[in-house]
Amino acid sequence: MEIERLTTIERIHQAAKIEFMEKGFRSASLRNIVKSVGMTTGAFYGYYKSKEALFAALVGEHYDYFIEMFKTAQEDFANLPHERQPEAMEGISGQCMFQMLHYAYEHLDVFQMILCCAEGTRFCGLVDEMVEIELESTHAYLNVLAELGRPSPKIDPHLEPVSYTHLDVYKRQY
């Protein structure tokens, strides 16, 4: 049986993932990461310029893909003929949700780091960014409904973000 040898980058990533998952980005110690890999902090800087750059190497590609997947679904829906949007909403929304959940579960550790361990990085606002995208799309859709002669009641702007983060959960329960 052949023993698998990890490259230095792989060992850094493995140690960083453990440290970030245990302590979160802010409390994670770069010294602990490099020490567990058996290298110096100076040697680490030959690979990454900062602890945040290391965190970005672990989660950045997945974060960007996830947000892009969500934006694409919103854009695809908005590009449908207006008269088709009401009937197509549930299908497009459900398909997008399934794809996003599937992707997140395929990369569960990464999304745990993004959702629970990213405070102090540009990645800590995933849910907020998605809510903003959803708000913008919803406002555009409300205009489409009004154009089709199906106006909806005015939504209190202070309650919109709360309702969007909870509405889908409620809808799927019942």
Language model feature labels by segment:
Residues 165-174:
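Conserved small/polar residues in nucleotide/adenosyl-binding loops
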Residues 1-5:
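N-terminal intrinsically disordered/low-complexity leader segments
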Residues 60-65:
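Short, basic, alpha-helical segments at the C-terminal edge of helix-turn-helix-like DNA-binding modules
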Residues 57, 71-103:
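Hydrophobic alpha-helical connector segments
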Residues 91, 95-106, 119-148, 158-161:
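Amphipathic alpha-helical packing segments from all-alpha helical-bundle domains
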Residues 112-114:
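Short, hydrophobic secondary-structure boundary micro-motifs
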Residues 11, 15, 19-53, 57-58:
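Helix-turn-helix
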